[in-house]
């Protein structure tokens, strides 16, 4: 399985230019909303996913959010960037989550929920830490697309689903079938794309804090 995972990761196409632009934008101190809108509008899928999240029951806004600018205003710049990058990465991997019996839209929703928890809880404690954790929180389960692809190619989908139903322990099943945690696979996907250690390390060591470099332990907890 390990060789199959590495093959899937090494076969991934390069990230689209929009993700690189968003990552550069995220790392600037000067937040220009109009510039962000111009970057996101280049990718209709990004726009669609941002609007779906903004109109989801998670937020419960009274009126329908129909424009990107209003969505950014309500969700916040950092949250919006996380959704945009996450949807672009999902589309780049071009896989599905059939092995987990969930849809890609379910993935976007649950990832947004994890990000919203960080956005709500951590911001009251440490605003700077919150901004650093939003993107890792959204992206931490990306490895599931690789796992699902490998499971399907090995024709073990029914077996994997049965194990999930019996154990109710996703992490255990992933480790058993893959030999790696989802976090480790996700981290290796992002290492393949040369993404920042600020994204990779909190995900890679979330379940192995003892091995985590000291400078990243707070982010991985």
Residue ranges of model-derived segments:
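Conserved alpha-helical "signature site"
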Residues: 1-153, 170-195, 203-219
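Post-HEXXH active-site segment of zinc metalloproteases
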Residues: 151-168
């Amino acid at each position: 399985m390990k060789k199959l995972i590495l093959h899937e990761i090494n076969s991934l196409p390069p990230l689209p230019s929009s993700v690189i632009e968003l990552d550069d934008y995220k790392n600037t101190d000067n937040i220009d909303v109009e510039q962000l809108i111009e970057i996101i509008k280049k990718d209709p899928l990004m726009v669609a996913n941002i609007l779906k999240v903004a109109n989801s029951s998670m937020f419960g806004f009274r009126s329908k959010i129909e424009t990107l600018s209003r969505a950014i205003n309500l969700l916040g710049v950092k949250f919006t960037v996380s959704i945009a990058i996450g949807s672009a990465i999902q589309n780049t991997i071009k896989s599905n989550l059939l092995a987990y019996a969930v849809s890609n839209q379910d993935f976007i929703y649950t990832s947004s929920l994890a990000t919203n928890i960080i956005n709500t809880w951590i911001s009251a404690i440490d605003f700077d830490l919150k901004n650093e954790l939003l993107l890792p929180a959204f992206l931490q389960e990306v490895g599931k697309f690789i796992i699902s692809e490998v499971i399907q190619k090995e024709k073990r989908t029914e077996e994997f689903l049965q194990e999930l139903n019996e154990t109710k322990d996703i992490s255990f099943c992933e480790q058993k079938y893959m030999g790696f945690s989802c976090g480790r696979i996700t981290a290796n996907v992002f290492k393949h794309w040369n993404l920042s250690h600020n994204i990779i390390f909190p995900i890679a060591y979330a379940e192995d804090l003892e091995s985590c470099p000291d400078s990243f332990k707070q982010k991985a907890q």
